[in-house]
């Protein structure tokens, strides 16, 4: 069966892109990275794409509508069926988001709907929560909204600062994003309003990573 073609949009280091590249290196993984697009020419993620022979493009210095048109053209030429935002730090044109509705996903370093937007780790620490994590969701026009596909939970430990919490969450992101893309590629998801139902699995077995597992791995 042909693998799902994924287009990844990045702005920076591309560590979640690398997690998807690593997953797709397994020939049994049901998705492949067809193209990478960055809005910044200095994004380290472009080097990651180049090193593995993935077509990559820079679309910069354009207004929102022009950026959307150029990006949509690249995605179409690559035969992309799913767009994955991976550390992509530009707000997308509403028409573009609507055109890719239910075919575009994002990963955010908090347990949405808590702590959307910028500095979610800072928000989590200020709120005094005991657990944080990351969320993969289908993209909607409002920032960090849309039906939730999967979440990973990590503990907030005594003495954490933004950097230590971000590092713990990032490790979970690298596990969660390939899982979520797999679920999309295997057509195991059904959107019901603002909920995502996963065929053949009962949450939290598939739709979440267990906090005790993350706690144990963090201390190993």
Predicted regions: what they are:
Residues 1-44, 48:
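N-terminal Rossmann-like dinucleotide-binding module
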Residues 23, 86-199:
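Donor/substrate-binding cores of folate-linked one-carbon enzymes
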Residues 49-58:
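Short, conserved SAM-binding/catalytic segment
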Residues 119, 193-220:
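Internal anion-binding site segments
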Residues 34, 81, 102:
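Conserved acidic residues
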Residues 57-62, 107:
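Short beta->alpha connector loops at strand-helix junctions that form conserved
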Residues 38-39, 64-68, 78-94:
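N-terminal glycine-rich "phosphate-gripper" loop used for MgATP/nucleotide binding
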């Amino acid at each position: 069966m042909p693998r799902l073609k994924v287009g990844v949009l990045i702005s920076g280091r591309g560590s979640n892109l690398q997690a998807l590249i690593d997953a797709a290196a397994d020939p049994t993984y049901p998705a492949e990275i067809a193209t990478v697009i960055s809005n910044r020419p200095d994004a380290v993620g472009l080097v990651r794409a180049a090193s593995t022979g993935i077509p990559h493009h820079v679309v910069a210095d354009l207004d929102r509508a022009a950026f959307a048109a150029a990006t949509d053209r690249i995605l179409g030429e690559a035969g992309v069926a799913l767009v994955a935002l991976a550390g992509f730090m530009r707000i997308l044109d509403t028409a573009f988001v609507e055109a890719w509705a239910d075919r575009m996903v994002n990963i955010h370093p908090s347990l949405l709907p808590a702590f959307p937007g910028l500095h979610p780790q800072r928000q989590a620490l200020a709120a005094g929560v005991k657990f944080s994590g990351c969320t993969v969701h289908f993209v909607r026009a409002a920032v960090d909204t849309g039906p939730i596909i999967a979440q990973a939970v990590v503990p907030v430990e005594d003495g954490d600062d933004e950097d230590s919490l971000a590092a713990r969450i990032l490790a979970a992101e690298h596990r969660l994003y390939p899982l979520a893309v797999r679920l999309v590629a295997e057509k195991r998801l059904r959107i019901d309003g603002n909920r995502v139902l996963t065929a053949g699995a009962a949450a939290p077995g598939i739709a979440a990573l267990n906090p005790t597992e993350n706690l144990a791995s963090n201390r190993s």
